[in-house]
């Protein structure tokens, strides 16, 4: 029997000014999609800047198990260049073994979309956190194509997916804003004859649509009579291999960015950060609170907007964060709550119900951790209310992260500005999205260490 991997507790102490120019790892959302669409394209796709975290590697292994050939070459500076030789739309092979997606919720849900319209059977599983996350909101629309799913109660993994040999085109209105649900339906539509349409009342990140277009799929955007966005995909295209330059992940950039805002006299530049309009809610919110964030050299790379961010330490003021902003920053609320704890005045973050079904119940985890660190915080339904005093938080707590990478990184940032050190009980999950986080932060001057 393989012995369990021991926890890796990390501790952050109050920091002196942070400084430097860094590039955080590649965007996780785009990395998953690049591997999947490269695996369905005809020819060889070259990917630079791929996030080499555990979640994305799980997707790479899954695509290999279904016939794609994936290889990594290392450049002189140690960066990885990935190549994917695709099998063509409709060419996925039935995997010989269970597909273990680890902690990759995005990878698992998007993969279900691909599997749903291929004539094969596959079994998906994951780690304890992923096995506890609901999948029904993805499997319900995918069943409309003709696929069937057998999982644990509540539609949880492990789950057997039986793809249909005769998929039917679908028109699906997304009931709750979710880029993962939208993307799973569009990916299922790739191997479906005719037109598949997703109706989206509230806009969510559009990485899937951008990358489908980059690989040559025919997409049509419009509006219905209620003002909702309609995305129509023509099925069974021949996707063409295309080079992909993955921008730095704005959700990962959020942690050094907020640290630079909060640690006095800091000055940090983050290079090549993805600036997709549906991903910059945190930047907009921090600037409203008073953060000094300059957007330098805006540009387009592989269909995605990118820029460098120059960040200086700033005094923040509490604000109201509307529910409508949640889709553009759903992963950034834990670190925004840390910023709010250091601001002067009250910050109310509305519409956070989605946080309850992430890698952990993030809403409860954030509130519990902040309270343990001496912050005045309350939860009112789906609203998180943080009463900042404009002073240094007490800190001094050990925070249970429950295998949630973003909770872990958020509270390490809090430790950099707290009177007493903050400890997280286990930092292993950070590698799922941000390998090298501690090394990068210590390079800026942050006192974060293994204990």
UniProtKB/Swiss-Prot annotation:
Instruction: State what this protein does.
Output: Catalyzes the transfer of the enolpyruvyl moiety of phosphoenolpyruvate (PEP) to the 5-hydroxyl of shikimate-3-phosphate (S3P) to produce enolpyruvyl shikimate-3-phosphate and inorganic phosphate.
Q: Which residues form the active site?
A: 331 (proton acceptor)
User: For binding phosphoenolpyruvate, which residues are annotated in this chain's numbering?
Assistant: 28, 105, 133, 180, 362, 406
What EC number(s) is this enzyme filed under? 2.5.1.19
**What CDD domains is this protein classified in?**
EPSP_synthase
| Gene name, Swiss-Prot/TrEMBL | aroA
Provenance organism: Rhodospirillum rubrum (strain ATCC 11170 / ATH 1.1.1 / DSM 467 / LMG 4362 / NCIMB 8255 / S1)
Q: Name one GO biological process term.
A: aromatic amino acid family biosynthetic process
Q: Which GO molecular function annotations are given, in alphabetical order?
A: 3-phosphoshikimate 1-carboxyvinyltransferase activity
The record lists 3-phosphoshikimate as bound by 28-29, 33, 178, 180, 331, 358
Disulfide bond: is it a keyword of this entry? no
The listed locations are: Cytoplasm
**Keyword annotations for this protein?**
Amino-acid biosynthesis, Aromatic amino acid biosynthesis, Cytoplasm, Transferase
Tell me what reaction this enzyme catalyses.
3-phosphoshikimate + phosphoenolpyruvate = 5-O-(1-carboxyvinyl)-3-phosphoshikimate + phosphate
Q: What is its main location?
A: cytoplasm
Which protein is depicted? 3-phosphoshikimate 1-carboxyvinyltransferase
Work out whether the entry's keyword set contains Amino-acid biosynthesis. yes
InterPro entries the UniProt entry points to: Enolpyruvate_Tfrase_dom, Enolpyruvate_Tfrase_sf, EPSP_synthase, EPSP_synthase_CS, RNA3'P_cycl/enolpyr_Trfase_a/b
Q: Which GO terms describe its cellular component?
A: cytoplasm
* Sequence similarity: Belongs to the EPSP synthase family.
Annotated metabolic or biological route of this protein: Metabolic intermediate biosynthesis; chorismate biosynthesis; chorismate from D-erythrose 4-phosphate and phosphoenolpyruvate: step 6/7
Subunit comment? Monomer.
